[in-house]
């Protein structure tokens, strides 16, 4: 039976892919990135393969692979590809399934559909990755409101970066959300270092609890 967990973020570059690799590895999950925009450098799927410690068979192929590193709606138009949001259906897997979005919740997949629209049809629990730097309070609370407005279950907040206790506290308090933990920046980003950091700062059981 599939147990899906969606990993999204407050912004692009927040650290979703590294966190997804850590989570997928800790849960021995299957990983899926529905849409990859940008193929010149290491793709998110390949980064997760490198960092998670999972066999390649646990990493599903992307539904859409787009050449240009841009918003999926634009990257698809440049490539002459039509993304069909209704075709993005959660794969049937055994055990946990970690699904990584792109950018933030309102990143457009097409001219009319955003990621959060697809998440709303899935109704799977969401882990919201948030920075700890200046500006994160507003960005994170807005993202929480967007999820709640669409009745999308929020599993909790995974903070990424240096410790910022007050920002983390006020986000959890005002957002009425669960703090899952904080993944620090790592001097050496390796499979072993990432696995150890995740184990120190997160409890894998929290990702299988009921949502807030």
Curated annotation (Swiss-Prot):
One GO term describing the cellular component: cytosol
Biological processes, Gene Ontology terms: biotin biosynthetic process
Binding site for ATP: 13-18, 100-103, 184-186
Annotated pathway: Cofactor biosynthesis; biotin biosynthesis; biotin from 7,8-diaminononanoate: step 1/2
Top-level EC class: ligase
Enzyme Commission number, as recorded: 6.3.3.3
Gene3D superfamilies reported for this sequence: P-loop containing nucleotide triphosphate hydrolases (3.40.50.300)
UniProt cross-references to InterPro entries, sorted A to Z: DTB_synth_BioD, P-loop_NTPase
Coiled-coil ranges (or none): none
Keywords: ATP-binding, Biotin biosynthesis, Cytoplasm, Ligase, Magnesium, Metal-binding, Nucleotide-binding
Named cofactor requirement(s): Mg(2+)
Assigned protein family: Belongs to the dethiobiotin synthetase family.
Protein known as: ATP-dependent dethiobiotin synthetase BioD
Organism the protein comes from: Rhodopseudomonas palustris (strain BisB5)
């Amino acid at each position: 039976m599939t147990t899906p967990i969606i990993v999204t973020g407050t912004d692009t570059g927040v650290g979703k892919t590294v966190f997804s690799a850590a989570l997928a590895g800790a849960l021995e999950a299957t990983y899926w990135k529905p849409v990859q925009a940008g193929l010149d450098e290491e793709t998110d799927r390949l980064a997760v393969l490198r960092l998670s410690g999972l066999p390649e068979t646990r990493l599903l192929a992307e539904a859409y692979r787009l050449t240009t590193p841009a918003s999926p709606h634009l990257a698809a138009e440049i490539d002459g590809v039509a993304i069909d949001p209704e075709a993005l259906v959660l794969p049937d897997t055994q055990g946990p399934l970690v699904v990584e979005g792109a950018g933030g919740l309102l990143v457009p997949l097409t001219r009319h559909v955003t990621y959060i629209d697809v998440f709303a049809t899935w109704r799977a629990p969401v882990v919201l990755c948030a920075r700890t730097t200046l500006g994160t309070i507003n960005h994170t609370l807005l993202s929480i409101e967007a999820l709640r407005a669409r009745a999308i279950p929020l599993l909790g907040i995974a903070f990424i970066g240096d410790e910022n206790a007050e920002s983390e506290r006020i986000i959890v308090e005002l957002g009425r959300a669960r703090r899952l933990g904080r993944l620090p920046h790592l001097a050496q980003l390796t499979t072993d270092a990432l696995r150890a950091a995740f184990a120190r700062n997160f409890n894998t059981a929290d990702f299988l609890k009921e949502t807030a």
